[in-house]
Amino acid sequence: MRHIIELKDGWQFTNLDGQTSEVSIPHTWNAIDGQDGGDDYKRGTCTYTLALQKPEFDPDTQEVWIEFDGVNASAQVSLNGQDVCSHDGGYSTFRANLTGLLADENELVVKADNSKNDRVYPQMADFTFYGGIYRMVRLLVVNKAHFALDYLGSSGIRVTATPEGAGAKVRVQSRVTTGDVTVTVIDRKGRVAGTGTGLDTTIEMAKARRWHGVEDPYLYTARCEVTVDGSVTDRLEIPFGVRSFRVDEKHGFILNDEPYDLHGVSRHQDRKGIGNAITREMHDEDMALIREIGATTLRLAHYQHDQYFYDLCDRNGLIVWAEIPYISKHMPNGRANTISQMEELIEQNYNHASIVCWGVSNEITIATKDKQDMLDNHRLLNDMIHQTDPTRFTTLACYAMCGPFNKVAHITDVVSWNLYLGWYVPGLFLNDLWIGFWHLCYPKRLLGYSEYGAEGMPNLHSDHPRRNDHTEEYQAVYHEYMLRCFRRHPWMWANHVWNMFDFAADARDQGGEPGMNHKGLVTFDRKTKKDSFYLYKAWWSSDRFVHICSKRFVDRCGKKTTIKVYSTDDTVTLMVNGKTVGKKTSSDHVFTFTVPLDGDLDVEAFSGLKKDTAHFHKVDKPNPAYKLVKNKNAQKSNWVDN
């Protein structure tokens, strides 16, 4: 059976300046300089060296493999001076067989390279390309008869579950080095639901509970075993869900033959002071916050995420858009890399019930218009996806300035747009016009919003919020409009807020904090939920609550002030300094009260048994700390212009 050894500690890291220090994996060398602005974080080749003791194994019957979950962006691996493997693409798993190269004492060297080049994606994007071995490294000691470890970093097993009536057919395809395969399907209670044998076996289940999104994310397990002469030599357990899905021009996304509203967020994986070298506990925290607002879908941008997080999506019922970092700028020398990254994305994630579509590219027309090579690359990827995985549909995210008639917008099965009308472009009403115009031109071609949002700083506030002021209040006003807008267009297939969390983009200088994109509903450190977070929770979640907005906007001036409240309920009562000042109803979860500002205010908002409180202080003049002070010497705030 498999024996797994994590190679976490004792690595010697040599940076670009030739300085060496001891580090633990996961690790990135850009955790600080990739988040502080200036577009000057260190990019190049750094070296990780590990004194590796040969694990116990029988070379006559066993093999030793090394597995990397993620090295950004290119990796060169050697053992005792001999080349082992190389890999281009910083977000996917890759492995190599070390069996014939191991001595008793070994020197393992990994060169990680995030240098600028013209062949490995991404090279131009609004996020930091952290260099390093930022996901786990392991040794795998396996019997020679095992599930394939050399096929595109995958498990070597594909599970395809097709609903049929009240039951299902479960096809399990296996790649093995040698031996026979036995498959046992087990339900959540550990009961056997079906068995099969062979490299390509189909198991019929008379009854099969559906995986139905956040309402019922029911998972089965395919226990797959390699046997030789009746003895089990390798075993993997693959969770899978039984579900059907499609898109419909009238009702959007359909799950298990029922309309299923896809409203959710996008996610970048990085953290403050940590970069992309995050832990499972951090993944868990992200998922808990996403579930709290009631999201039903998640766009995992702009690259392959950690396998553990896809597992969390399966278990929590989120519908996932998965994509490769073919982004912003088409590179003629990068075609092979787009293909290899897409192949790895599909093979490594094929069994995840949560994933319904593969994203081909993001905003590719920022730097490349509808040129033939770019279009050919997209058609090649689109065709390859359909051939490799006919069970899912394709999509892409178009750049805001990519018009509805651009050819690239009509290659994939469905399309989405990254649109910031009301943020980068004045006029929130333009969203309704744009959506309506698209639907008029292409009534049978499904549209979604893959990105929409506005920057919001929890320390910036205004009585009269306006576009580009970066206040928490304008971000909330923006999202209030967008939620009402999408309600007016129920045929859209999916909409994703950009972003669930603030994230690092070292080329940016906006909001008074260089190196950051502040469009998140939650701050970079995950410690502060902005008002917009509670707005979405009010619209999407069934958890009853009341939230008073602008609590951080403490100092207020004038004769009157506005108190805004979000709640899942349709009625809210407001008390100020112990007296009831109003009771309001709302169909959009937003309740606005205007109250006299005669002095300090102790405010309480009630809905049923739920309550929230806030304190506001009367001042003579606006607090200057609440207003963004723009740095005249700062670089251009729009990263595209840099």
Language model features: what each stretch is:
Residues 171-173, 287-290, 297-539, 543-562, ...:
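Substrate-binding/catalytic cleft of secreted carbohydrate-active enzymes
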Residues 1-302, 310-312, 316-320, 341-344, ...:
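Secreted/periplasmic carbohydrate-active enzymes, especially glycoside hydrolases
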